[in-house]
Amino acid sequence: MSKAIKQNLADSKKMSAELFCLTYGAMVTEMLKDYEDPKDVTIQLDKMGFNMGTRLADDFLAKNANVPRCVDTRQIADVLCRNAIPCYLGISATASSWTSGDREFTITLEANPLTELVQVPAHLVSAGLSYSQLIAGAIRGALEAVHFKVYASATDTGANTEIRIRFDQVLKDSLPAGEDD
């Protein structure tokens, strides 16, 4: 592939990221007008992210057949930070702030693409808007798709975004009603 074609591909990915960021910002603005309460917008962003995450889990597993099955939260954090987040957001992430028992940790995104071109007003943040909750919801949805129930919340700290993840339980496979083994 020629150098010019590679440069054009890189430029188109950057344009796509910028377009996504601006479109996301416009969508959140419209949601704030529709819902009026920033907490309700955060709930809706979480639901949207959850629905995206359930679909992204299948896509991720199809593209990454060599990723081992996770059996604990440290492995989950490792796969999220080394594979999933760089794959879908194009950024690096780190896991830290583990609680005793390894049931809760924080993923730090140092360059959140959603907040790259946006400055969220402080009064909306203090009123309960979590602008990056879409990402936390996507992580929650993806993990639920692979049978891990977690709680996830996002906090934008200005310089970076922190996603706090708390493990709740391993979900059991269940057959639809009326079907037995």
Swiss-Prot record:
TM stretches of this protein: none
Keywords: Endoplasmic reticulum, ER-Golgi transport, Golgi apparatus, Lipoprotein, Palmitate, Transport
Intracellular or extracellular location(s): Golgi apparatus, cis-Golgi network; Endoplasmic reticulum
Gene Ontology cellular-component terms listed: cis-Golgi network membrane; cytosol; endoplasmic reticulum; TRAPP complex
Listed GO biological process terms: cuticle development involved in collagen and cuticulin-based cuticle molting cycle; endoplasmic reticulum to Golgi vesicle-mediated transport; intra-Golgi vesicle-mediated transport; multicellular organism growth; protein secretion
Lipid modification (S-palmitoyl cysteine), residues: 70
Xref: CDD domains: TRAPPC3_bet3
PANTHER family documented for this protein: TRAFFICKING PROTEIN PARTICLE COMPLEX SUBUNIT 3
Family per record: Belongs to the TRAPP small subunits family. BET3 subfamily.
Record's subunit section: Homodimer. Part of the multisubunit TRAPP (transport protein particle) complex.
Function, as annotated: May play a role in vesicular transport from endoplasmic reticulum to Golgi. Required for the systemic spread of the RNAi response.
Protein name per UniProt: Trafficking protein particle complex subunit 3 homolog
Species of provenance: Caenorhabditis elegans
Gene that encodes it: trpp-3
